[in-house]
């Protein structure tokens, strides 16, 4: 063996081993190699816009160029590159067409008469090869209007007002390859109208008013490759072979029509068809053999129709299919073996479809699948062998984390801690406070308990976020369908509804006692306890009803990772949507309106009673303090509920709401009331401040006595709360004299300003 031969073999084997070192890297299921290095990354780190491999390999080949785009590049681009239609165009830019209309432009053998208000086809010399008559006023094409243009190859008639075309209108156009009739008013094409167009390859008739077509319509189109009938009003396709006179047809686009069903005979002669687009029609039924003749089909687009059921073997003959779009159909169930025959499938779109029976078995046979699109990113866990799975997030969660944003992951703990601490602090203080108004104290404790549940809800969400950190996608679907998620979601609704009802109850109490001090009805202890119990029972009923009937409410709380049913899902039943609207735009909106109206009336009433006061300056100061307190109470309610009302209202109008909105609302906006209620209703009130001062004074006195070695008996830690009256003569300070706020308000209406100062 010569040295040259040895060098040749070394070179060949060197390249082989070098290549194999990267391509033969074996990664476990759900992981994919980083090009030519021995490193594997999980599915969620591929095609995420970040160079996680270090050599950009995880971001290479992320574009989905399968289906029509690949077919276009493969056939049309290469074909027209090889067959240049205008070899003289660059060499002869001057006009070579004789008798050109004054308003038209000419270059070489191309004529441009766009937007020249032409009402008929102009008469020019017969050597023209391209004629553009767009944006004119042409209403009809009479017989033989193009008969002299034997060399015409491109004809543009878009955006005219064409309503009728004579059967002989295109007679003589033996060289025509592209015909554009888009954006006109054509309602019918007579059979044989294209009879002389034997070389026509592109026929574009989109955005017209065609209501029916038949095989004879396309008689003579032996060379047709592309037929576009988008956005017409076709209601059905013929039950005869559609491609009978179009044997070379590769691309058929019927998007945006009103087609209801597809017949078995329609595509029986379309054996060369590679792209079939049927999206945005009204197809509700498919026969098992509908696509059987289309054995060369590369892309099938059935998105945005009304298909509810897929026959089990409907795709069995589509062995060459590389792209399938079934998105946004109300498909009830997908068979486990639905895609078994699509061995070459590379792109699968299932967006907008709730796959209740999803399982890995559905996608396991699709070994060439590189792109898959779901309604929920949680479904990506059922296709771990697919490199690119979308969506990566729902705005709330991501493939890695239950809470996608680092800000949310931090603040869920901060907000929950503040909420729980504030409310527990107030609850724990109550046993040490001797209050003359026990009923009000009871209501405040009840409110704190409800608000504390919101903090517990956020703690649980934060805890599960920690538990699933870095691998949430593996657990996402099970988590949202779990009992834990259902209970956590119901806990949030329980907290929300009880808090809303209690705030309304407390507000109405204040309203009656201040606005109608001499007519207020005293409910008494028994009635107050009954009201509080009824509020909690109502909250429990509202929160747990969705758990009682799964068939009616479906997965009511499990529509997102935070288990909060803020906005409607497409898959929700009508009853569940009505129920959700009744809560947020019924109970809560009514309560918010009552609170705003009541506080406005209270302030107005106090302001009116202060007009006759002698100490005007003092009254103005007290009114300002009162106004500030009322403002902050109403403002926090508005800050919490107005965004929620807006989101719910928009979802009712079917406006698409980003998932990020839901997560920010749940973590930052919804807990506002729960976190601030202890501050507004307890910690900033005058009795609390006086109690703190008294406690501090007693503490300093005791410390002073102890330092002098004297024994002292300091008064016990007491907070005497007089709500809404907080300044009373000593002779009226008797436990049995005033037991309810309304009675105290009878003494003097002018002293009401002290209630909130």
From Swiss-Prot:
Residues 431-443, 508-527, 599-629, 673-757 are cytoplasmic. GO terms for biological process: adenylate cyclase-activating G protein-coupled receptor signaling pathway; extracellular matrix organization; hormone-mediated signaling pathway; lung connective tissue development; myofibroblast differentiation; nipple morphogenesis; parturition. Residues 1-409, 465-486, 549-577, 651 are extracellular. One of its GO terms (molecular function) is hormone binding. The keyword Calcium applies. Gene3D superfamilies: Low-density Lipoprotein Receptor, Rhodopsin 7-helix transmembrane proteins, Ribonuclease Inhibitor. Residues 91-127 form the LRRNT domain. Keywords: Calcium, Cell membrane, Disulfide bond, G-protein coupled receptor, Glycoprotein, Leucine-rich repeat, Membrane, Metal-binding, Receptor, Repeat, Transducer, Transmembrane, Transmembrane helix. Residues 26-63 form the LDL-receptor class A domain. LRR repeats lie at residues 151-172, 175-196, 199-220, 223-244, 248-269, 272-293, 296-317, 320-341, 344-365. Ca(2+) binds at residues 45, 48, 50, 52, 58-59. Glycans are attached at residues 36, 127, 264, 272, 325, 368. It is found in: Cell membrane. InterPro entries: GPCR_Rhodpsn, GPCR_Rhodpsn_7TM, LDL_receptor-like_sf, LDLR_class-A_CS, LDrepeatLR_classA_rpt, Leu-rich_rpt, Leu-rich_rpt_typical-subtyp, LRR_dom_sf. Pfam families: 7tm_1 (PF00001), Ldl_recept_a (PF00057), LRR_8 (PF13855). Disulfide bonds join 27-40, 34-53, 47-62, 485-563. It is a multi-pass membrane protein. The chain crosses the membrane at residues 410-430, 444-464, 487-507, 528-548, 578-598, 630-650, 652-672. Belongs to the G-protein coupled receptor 1 family. Interacts with C1QTNF8. Receptor for relaxins. The activity of this receptor is mediated by G proteins leading to stimulation of adenylate cyclase and an increase of cAMP. Binding of the ligand may also activate a tyrosine kinase pathway that inhibits the activity of a phosphodiesterase that degrades cAMP. This is Relaxin receptor 1. It comes from Homo sapiens. The lineage of its organism: Eukaryota, Metazoa, Chordata, Craniata, Vertebrata.
């Amino acid at each position: 063996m010569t040295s040259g031969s040895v060098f040749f073999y070394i070179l060949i084997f060197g390249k082989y081993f070098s290549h194999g070192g990267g391509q033969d890297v074996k990664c476990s299921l759900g992981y994919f190699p980083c090009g030519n290095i021995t490193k594997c990354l999980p599915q969620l780190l591929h095609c995420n816009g970040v160079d996680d491999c270090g050599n950009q390999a995880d971001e290479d080949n992320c574009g989905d160029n399968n289906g029509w785009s690949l077919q276009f590049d493969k056939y049309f681009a290469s074909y027209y590159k090889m067959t240049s239609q205008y070899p003289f165009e660059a060499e002869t830019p001057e006009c070579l067409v004789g008798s050109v209309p004054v308003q038209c432009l000419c270059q070489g053998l191309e004529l441009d008469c766009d937007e020249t208000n032409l009402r008929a086809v102009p008469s020019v010399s017969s050597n023209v090869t391209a004629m553009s008559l767009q944006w004119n006023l042409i209403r009809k094409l009479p017989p033989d209007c193009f008969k002299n243009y034997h060399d015409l190859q491109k004809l543009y008639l878009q955006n005219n007002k064409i309503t009728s075309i004579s059967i002989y209108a295109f007679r003589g156009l033996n060289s025509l390859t592209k015909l554009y009739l888009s954006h006109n008013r054509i309602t019918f094409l007579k059979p044989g109208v294209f009879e002389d167009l034997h070389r026509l390859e592109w026929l574009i008739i989109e955005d017209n008013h065609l209501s029916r077509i038949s095989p004879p319509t396309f008689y003579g189109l032996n060379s047709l490759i592309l037929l576009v009938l988008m956005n017409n009003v076709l209601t059905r396709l013929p039950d005869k072979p559609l491609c009978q006179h179009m044997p070379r047809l590769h691309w058929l686009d019927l998007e945006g029509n009103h087609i209801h069903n597809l017949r078995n005979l329609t595509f029986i002669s379309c054996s060369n068809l590679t792209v079939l687009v049927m999206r945005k029609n009204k197809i509700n039924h498919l026969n098992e053999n509908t696509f059987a003749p289309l054995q060369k089909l590369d892309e099938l687009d059935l998105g945005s129709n009304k298909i509810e059921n897929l026959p089990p073997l409907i795709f069995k003959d589509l062995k060459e299919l590389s792209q399938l779009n079934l998105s946004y159909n109300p498909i009830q169930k997908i068979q486990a073996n639905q895609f078994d025959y699509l061995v070459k499938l590379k792109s699968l779109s299932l967006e907008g479809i709730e796959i209740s029976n999803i399982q890995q078995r559905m996608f396991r046979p699709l070994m060439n699948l590189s792109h898959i699109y779901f309604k929920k990113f949680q479904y990506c866990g059922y296709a771990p062998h697919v490199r690119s799975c979308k969506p990566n997030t729902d705005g709330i969660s991501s493939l890695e984390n239950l809470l996608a944003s680092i800000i949310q992951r931090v603040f869920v703990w901060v907000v929950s801690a503040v909420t729980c601490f504030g409310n527990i602090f107030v609850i724990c203080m109550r046993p040490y406070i001797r209050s003359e108004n026990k009923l009000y104290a009871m209501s405040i404790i009840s409110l704190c308990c409800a608000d504390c549940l919101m903090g517990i809800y956020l703690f649980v969400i934060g805890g599960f976020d920690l538990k699933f950190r870095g691998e949430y996608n593996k657990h996402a679907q099970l988590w949202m369908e779990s009992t834990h998620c259902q209970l956590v979601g119901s806990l949030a609704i329980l907290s929300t509804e009880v808090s809303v009802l209690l705030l309304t109850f407390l507000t109405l109490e204040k309203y009656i006692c201040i606005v109608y001090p001499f007519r207020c009805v005293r409910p008494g202890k028994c009635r107050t306890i009954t009201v509080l119990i009824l509020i909690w029972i109502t909250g429990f009923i509202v929160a747990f009803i969705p758990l009682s009937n799964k068939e009616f409410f479906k997965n009511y709380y499990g529509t997102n990772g935070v288990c909060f049913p803020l906005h409607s899902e497409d898959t929700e039943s009508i009853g569940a949507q009505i129920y959700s609207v009744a809560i947020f735009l019924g109970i809560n909106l009514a309560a918010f309106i009552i609170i705003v109206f009541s506080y406005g009336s209270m302030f107005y009433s106090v302001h009116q009673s202060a007009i006759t006061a002698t100490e005007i300056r003092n009254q103005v100061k007290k009114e300002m303090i009162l106004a500030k307190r009322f403002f902050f109470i109403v403002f926090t309610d508005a800050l919490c509920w107005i965004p929620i009302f807006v989101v719910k209202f928009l979802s009712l109008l079917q406006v698409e709401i980003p998932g990020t909105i839901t997560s920010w609302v749940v973590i930052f906006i919804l807990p506002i009331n729960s976190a601030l209620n202890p501050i507004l209703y307890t910690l900033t009130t005058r009795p609390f401040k006086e109690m703190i001062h008294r406690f501090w004074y007693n503490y300093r006195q005791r410390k002073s006595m102890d330092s002098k070695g004297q024994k002292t008996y300091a008064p016990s830690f007491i907070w005497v709360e007089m709500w809404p009256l907080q300044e009373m003569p000593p002779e009226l300070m008797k436990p049995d004299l005033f037991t309810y706020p309304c009675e105290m308000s009878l003494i003097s209406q002018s002293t009401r300003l002290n209630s909130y100062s």
